[in-house]
Amino acid sequence: MAAARRGSAGSEARLSLATFLLGASVLALPLLTRAGLQGRTGLALYVAGLNALLLLLYRPPRYQIAIRACFLGFVFGCGVLLSFSQSSWNHFGWYVCSLSLFHYSEYLVTAVNNPKSLSLDSFLLNHSLEYTVAALSSWIEFTLENIFWPELKQITWLSATGLLMVVFGECLRKAAMFTAGSNFNHVVQSEKSDTHTLVTSGVYAWCRHPSYVGWFYWSIGTQVMLCNPICGVVYALTVWRFFRDRTEEEEISLIHFFGEEYLDYKKRVPTGLPFIKGVKVEL
C-alpha cells in the first residue's frame, strides 16, 4: 500500500512538473507577437490553447493537479517577462516569480518527500482567507503607490534586499521540509503516527522551527521587494503573531508526543523566530 502511494505521488510529481513547465512556456509569447499577433490577442489564444490541451490530455483527478501546476507555471512565466520589461512593474515581476515558485515547490517537495500527506491542498493556494486578503492588499498598495509615487517602486537596492530575504526564506523552508522528511506536514498534528520521530539534525540543530523561520522571512521579504511600506509593517506584525501562536500550538503536541526528549531539545535550541520562545512549560 505504501509503495503504491509512493508510486502514485511520484507520478503526480512528474505530472505537476511537466504542466508547470508547460505553463511557463508563456515565455515564448514575445515570439508570437513578433509573428504579427497583438499582445492581448496572443495571450488570450495562448491561455485558451493551454486549457484545451489540458482538458484533452487529463481527466480528474489528474486534471485538477495539472491545471493548478500549469497556472503556477504560467504565472511564473509572466513574472519573468515582467521582470525584464522596461517599466516600473519589473520588481513586481520578481514578486510574481517568487510567489508562484513558493506555491508550486510546496506541492512538489511534498510529493517527493512525504507522499502520504500529498493532496491538492499541498499547493497552499487555498491557505486561508487572511492569506488571500494579505496578498490582495499588497497588490493594491503596490499599484496605488506605483501610480502616485512611481519613484518609490524603483529603489533597486531595497528590492534586491527583499529578493535575498525571499531566497533565504525559501531555501531554509525547503531544507527544513527535506530534513524532516515524512515528519513534515502542512497541518499541525494532534495524534502521533507510528513513523513520527523527533528531528534534531540539519537545520533543526540551528532552530526548532526552521520552516516557520523561512516562511517568516519570505513573507516580509516579499514586501521589502515590492517597496511596500504599509504592508511591510503590517506583514511583519501579522506573521510574527501568527507564528507565535502556531509555534505554541505545535509545541504542545510535540511535548505530548516526545515528552522529556522534546523538552531537552527545547532547552538547547531556540525557535529561530525573533522574540518567540515557544510554549511555556510549568515544572
Swiss-Prot record:
Q: Its Enzyme Commission number?
A: 2.1.1.100
Q: Per the UniProt entry, what is one GO biological process?
A: regulation of cellular senescence
**Which residues point to the Lumenal side?**
33-40, 87-91, 149-153, 228
Q: Which reaction does it catalyse?
A: [protein]-C-terminal S-[(2E,6E)-farnesyl]-L-cysteine + S-adenosyl-L-methionine = [protein]-C-terminal S-[(2E,6E)-farnesyl]-L-cysteine methyl ester + S-adenosyl-L-homocysteine
GO MF, one annotated term: cAMP response element binding protein binding
At which positions is substrate bound?
246
Alphabetized InterPro entries for the sequence: ICMT_MeTrfase, PPMT_MeTrfase
- Belongs to which family? Belongs to the class VI-like SAM-binding methyltransferase superfamily. Isoprenylcysteine carboxyl methyltransferase family.
Q: What is its biological role? A: Catalyzes the post-translational methylation of isoprenylated C-terminal cysteine residues.
Name this polypeptide is given? Protein-S-isoprenylcysteine O-methyltransferase
- Species of origin reads Mus musculus
Name the encoding gene, please: Icmt
